[in-house]
Amino acid sequence: MAAAAFDTTENFAIEMDARDPMSRFRGRFHIPPAPDGSASVYLVGHSLGLQPKTVRAYLEQELKDWETLGVEGHFRGKHPWMPYHRLLTEQTARLVCAQPSEVVVMNSLTVNLHLMMVSFYRPTRERHNILIEGSAFPSDQYAVQSQIKFHGFDPASSLLELCPRVGEATMRDEDILELIEREGQSIALILLGGVNYATGQAFDMAEITKAGHAQGCVVAFDCAHAAGNLELKLHEWDVDWAAWCSYKYLNGGPGCIGGCFVHERYARDFELPRFAGWWGHDQETRFKMGPEFHPMAGAEGWQLSNPSILTMAALRASMEIFDEAGIGKLRQRSIALTGYLEFLLDQQKSARFEIITPREPERRGAQLSIRVAAGNRSVCDRLVEEGALCDWREPDILRVAPVPLYCSYRDCYRFVQRFVANLN
């Protein structure tokens, strides 16, 4: 919806929620209560998604099978544990628009980044640089720096960082592509976030991949803030690999299992160096316990150990909702909700805050990052105390995300009312 279609009254927000058929999915989640007992305004799904109401039953089923079957739950449970991760394969493939053989749920995000870099960061004397965002999430920075050091190089000379122009908060697409063209022959790996965690900027993954491949670079994305937020097309965009967590927009719960995408062109490249574990071994001979590792084809060949059933059960509850809603429809609702929140903030015409997230819908997801004058974190603290949940990133950024699965237009309205009151 264009901003001209919005208005600033609460009745408008209530009417929009009533007319929107996608609003029904809100009822599938537990909304934490505010201090006064009403439903909180939960705009922090970019940090931790809400709990689907079916999670408890899904967890209890696995606990019951463990209680009554013991080890036989691997084979005789309602959902046998041996192939349990494959209950999520088709859903994950649909979510990121990939072939089922290209995706797997395993480990956690930073672990998966390391496993992928073992295979796909192969530095040479001439081509040893890794390109990341200067404002990448710290864990990504730590992982990349440690990989560079592990290979005998120095981050001071082998780490390239993308930074905005002076006086700007986000990066211009043309600057990213120009840097890749200029430095590409020295870059071994491009590893960017699909969406920057601090600014909410979404990157043009298709064009970045095309530009990187033209220079001979491996191109990968940390999709922690993109999976379940944007409509991804990882296979079509020809991305080499990607990794993500599932506790943000995917609502898998705190510390939930992560996910990986490896393009099908690597499915049977068994000569690629990789760290190996028994769960990545050919399943037909896994229990023969032989000494030699024979990886499964596709992304499953990068698995190490059997994954946690309880975290996968929680994630399955959410992924079933994603399947029902459809990521395309959710993305359209997200564009409208975030646009409405942006409209309400703009109507304040205040010098006390500034939206630094790109204005173009195609250059952002659900998140808006608001720079608060003088780095006044107390504004965020008071909002949380009142039941308007958001979060703060130093030195001066308040992050809010009207997640389309469970946030409402009225949530956006109530947040802006409280935000302005606290600013004043």
Swiss-Prot record:
What does the record give as its pathway?
Amino-acid degradation; L-kynurenine degradation; L-alanine and anthranilate from L-kynurenine: step 1/1; Cofactor biosynthesis; NAD(+) biosynthesis; quinolinate from L-kynurenine: step 2/3
Cofactor(s) needed, names only, are: pyridoxal 5'-phosphate
What are its E.C. numbers? 3.7.1.3
Return any one Pfam family short name: KYNU_C
Q: Name one GO cellular component term.
A: cytoplasm
The record's GO molecular-function terms, alphabetically, read:
kynureninase activity; pyridoxal phosphate binding
Superkingdom assignment? Bacteria
Which InterPro entries does the protein's record reference? Kynureninase (IPR010111), PyrdxlP-dep_Trfase (IPR015424), PyrdxlP-dep_Trfase_major (IPR015421), PyrdxlP-dep_Trfase_small (IPR015422)
**Catalytic reaction equation(s):** L-kynurenine + H2O = anthranilate + L-alanine + H(+); 3-hydroxy-L-kynurenine + H2O = 3-hydroxyanthranilate + L-alanine + H(+)
Keyword annotations: Hydrolase, Pyridine nucleotide biosynthesis, Pyridoxal phosphate
Binding-site positions, pyridoxal 5'-phosphate? L109, T110, F137, P138, S139, D140, D222, H225, Y247, W278, N306
- N6-(pyridoxal phosphate)lysine: residues carrying this PTM: K248
GO biological process terms, semicolon-separated: anthranilate metabolic process; L-kynurenine catabolic process; L-tryptophan catabolic process to kynurenine; NAD biosynthetic process; quinolinate biosynthetic process
NCBIfam families listed in its UniProt record: kynureninase
Q: What role does it play?
A: Catalyzes the cleavage of L-kynurenine (L-Kyn) and L-3-hydroxykynurenine (L-3OHKyn) into anthranilic acid (AA) and 3-hydroxyanthranilic acid (3-OHAA), respectively.
Quaternary structure and partners: Homodimer.
According to its UniProt record, which protein family does this protein belong to? Belongs to the kynureninase family.
Q: What's the protein name?
A: Kynureninase
- Gene name for this UniProt entry: kynU
